[in-house]
Structure formats: structure tokens, C-alpha cells
């Protein structure tokens, strides 16, 4: 069923999401089917509760992360953001990637905490800009553009993790 995760939390299937409402509904659902509540029930009911809890947790993780949420919405449109046609980046983004990677390598080898923090801030701003572009792409139903942005978002998230790992 398409957009099952949104239905589970009774949220509209759209990129823009009320995080507080998602958190509230997650806590309510998680409490409802927590496996401990089913300790005195049959093995079948315990297994059902465990499966439901797993689904709720997976749905929550997917919807909570904007890039994963975007990829999930694209799947509902039969678009795989990881398909080969979406793995090619625009030349400008490729050049920017190279610059960021070089800056990370230099700052890391020099153990320059200030340069690493500055790069982390730059990537954080790029991530915020990308999320705005994703919102616009979904609003305009430009799903191919959204798929490209998902790939860029994954790159930025990975780079940000590498920067954080390099920070003392």
C-alpha cells in the first residue's frame, strides 16, 4: 500500500511534515502496541505486537528524516531515487563535492578544528537549502528533480558525518 507510513500516523502524504505531531502520534502508537503489554497474551498476539512495533519504528525513522521521507514519497510515485538515472550529479554539484572533499582532507590532515567547524557549518547550510529545494520540487510535483535532490542530500549527510568524525 502506497504511503502506508503516513496512514499509520494519520498524516497527509506530503514532504512538509509537522514533526511535533509525528512525535506525538509515534509515542501513542508505540505505547499501544509495546511488546510488554502483550506479555500475558498468546504467542501469536505477542508476535503480532512485535511486528507492529517494528513497523511503527521503521515508519517513524523514515518519516522523521527528511531525505528518507522524500525517497519514500518518490517510491509512491514509482520513482527510485537510487536508480542509475538519478545517480548522475550536475557538473556544478560535482565540482562543489570535490571542493568540499578537498577542504575536508586539508582540514583533517592539518588537524584544523576551526576549518572543520567552518566546513560543517557550510554543509549544514547546504542541507537546509536542499530541504527548501525539495519542498519546492514536491509542491510543484517535480519528482525527477526531487530524486536528484535526494541523492545530493544523501551525499551531504554522509559528508557531514565524515566531518563530525574528524572533529576532536
Where do the language-model regions lie?
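C-terminal accessory/regulatory regions appended to core domains
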Residues: 1-168
Amino acid at each position: 500500500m502506497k504511503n502506508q507510513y503516513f496512514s499509520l500516523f494519520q498524516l497527509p502524504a506530503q514532504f512538509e511534515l509537522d514533526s511535533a505531531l509525528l512525535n506525538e502520534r509515534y509515542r501513542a502508537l508505540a505505547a499501544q502496541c509495546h511488546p510488554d503489554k502483550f506479555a500475558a497474551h498468546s504467542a501469536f498476539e505477542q508476535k503480532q505486537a512485535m511486528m507492529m512495533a517494528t513497523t511503527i519504528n521503521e515508519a517513524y525513522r523514515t518519516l522523521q528524516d527528511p531525505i528518507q521521507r522524500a525517497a519514500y514519497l518518490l517510491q509512491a510515485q514509482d520513482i527510485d531515487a537510487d536508480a542509475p538515472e538519478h545517480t548522475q550529479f550536475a557538473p556544478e554539484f560535482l565540482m562543489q563535492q570535490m571542493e568540499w572533499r578537498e577542504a575536508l582532507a586539508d582540514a583533517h590532515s592539518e588537524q584544523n578544528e576551526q576549518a572543520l567547524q567552518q566546513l560543517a557549518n557550510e554543509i549544514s547550510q547546504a542541507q537546509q537549502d536542499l530541504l527548501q529545494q525539495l519542498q519546492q520540487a514536491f509542491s510543484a510535483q517535480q519528482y525527477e528533480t526531487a530524486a536528484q535532490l535526494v541523492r545530493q542530500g544523501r551525499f551531504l549527510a554522509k559528508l557531514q558525518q565524515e566531518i563530525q568524525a574528524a572533529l576532536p
